[in-house]
């Protein structure tokens, strides 16, 4: 029996191959973890643009994430700022240079390939991969990193969205960005 006879093994090998093909397009200017951190910061909400959230997204230690963030800061791709209401909190923002680099993101090739899938296939793939990612995440550290839709913390009404977890009003755009505190609403 071939080592690729089982469907789960074939799928795992394909996922790994897709990852290698996508990483092969990455410019030498950034390491893979740096690309991932920069991508995350560009699509995360303001509550999630913090070193701990980046570490959770990268599934690494805070120390390793800190090294990645320092490299991005040295390259002028992100900047650190203190939170306006809590000076103990560090907020991370992509710079104009960082956002411009993302326009040349090597991941665009993979995004375009996925965009060519029939919508039902893309939806099924997204749901399946999210389930697999959830299963692989360390127990007790399973941030979903989704927008506000379907989150138990979202309080919406009267044209205003509010996050009960952070006790803050949210702009329309903010509700669509990745959040480290997303917790699926009970159905």
Language-model features: locations:
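Long, low-complexity, charge-rich intrinsically disordered regions
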Residues: 154-187
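N-terminal leader segment of winged-helix/HTH proteins
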Residues: 1-28
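N-terminal helix-turn-helix DNA-binding core of bacterial DNA-binding proteins
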Residues: 23-61
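Terminal interaction helix/tail motif
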Residues: 104, 108-152
